[in-house]
Amino acid sequence: MTRLTTIDTDALWDGIDEQRARTAGLLEGLTPEQWEHPSLCDGWTVRHVAAHLTMQQQRVRDALGFISRHPRILRSMPLNTFIHDAGVIQAQTLSTEEIIAAIRNGMGSRRHNLGLTPLETLTDILVHSQDIAIPLGVDLPMRPALSAAAATRRWDTRNTWLATVNRRLPLDSYQLRATDTDWSRGQGPDVSGPISAILLLLTGRTAALEHLTGDGADVLRLTQTRLA
């Protein structure tokens, strides 16, 4: 299981702030049509994903306040449905300007959602920033070291409840190998490429297969084609 030293934690939060700034900067330049463009998240537009990112720092009091204002959310179960519906409600509640401001206002804060660690916050901002950028054809950088930390956390927790919030791909029988940083996990047919693409694959984003090579990547692409 991934553990963090004090230095690691400082670097991690700096990286979270860096990606929040990049994401807010991207959002500031979008047209109204782009805000309503489908994201990589099923059933969510760019606006929904951005609104979800404003909820990264909710504690118990914040969550209870949200539920009291929107009691119908209690009918949204299981967890993935709750997260989806909360993002939709938040997107309806906040204006474009308020969403961007809320993401920027999170910079410098070290609060994270109850029951999670800063590594989940990192994964959330990295992956969801790509959920916004990729469908819009925007290249939004992610630092390989940060993507590697998030990928390690996702691999280590792939059989826990934390993995239930992502689409699960059958990756245990493959070797995942980054080509831009020293990172590899698993055994089996090779799946190679940038660590950013591996992170997206670990979180169920099959769009990442476009940037991955190897016998294993070919098998995964064929499997996804058959399922389509």
What is each model feature region?
Residues 1-12, 59-76, 98-101, 105-228:
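Structured surface interface patches that mediate subunit assembly and partner/cofactor docking
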Residues 4-15, 34-55, 83, 88, ...:
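Alpha-helical scaffold segments that form or flank carboxylate-/histidine-based iron centers
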Residues 15-19, 95:
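Soluble or luminal CAZymes and related metallo-dependent hydrolases
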Residues 19-22, 26, 99:
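Amphipathic, well-ordered alpha-helical segments in soluble domains
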Residues 27-35:
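Extracellular-facing binding/remodeling surfaces
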Residues 82-98, 102:
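A short, structured beta-strand-centered segment in the mid-to-C-terminal lobe
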